[in-house]
Amino acid sequence: MDIKQIHHVAIICSDYKRSKAFYTELLGFRVIAETYRAERESYKLDLEVGKGHQIELFSFPNPAERPSYPEARGLRHLAFAVPDVEKSVQELQEKGVAVEDIRIDPLTGQKFTFFADPDGLPLELYEEGI
């Protein structure tokens, strides 16, 4: 097996319009493609994150909630590399997003913090190494 990289991360949201606005307008991800599948009553939104990375945002009628606290099995969080965590936190807070206090990774010495998407999915901002 010759795995090169992660191709995409798929997220199922409860409110498509709200989540689309969050990821495109608030976080600034670029829309690659948007498809509505009538037979599934479902949208699929392909978003570009940086260069060569994608998030697929899906909507389904009445998706079941996934427990995430306390530390349920499965995806724990999705992390985004940023050049300046403090600046990114300020931008999010100016847009009304609640952000946890900035912490220092004891293993790398890098700054990081967490916030959540509209469905409560934990998202991390991790400062790129210098």
What are these regions (language model features)?
Residues 32-33, 40-43, 62-68, 101:
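A short, acidic/glycine-rich surface segment
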Residues 59-63, 127-130:
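Acetyl-CoA-dependent GNAT
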Residues 1-18, 75-80, 129-130:
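N-terminal beta-strand motif that seeds the catalytic metal site of vicinal oxygen chelate
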Residues 1-2, 35, 46, 89-130:
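Vicinal oxygen chelate
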Residues 12-53, 94:
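Core segments of cupin and vicinal oxygen chelate
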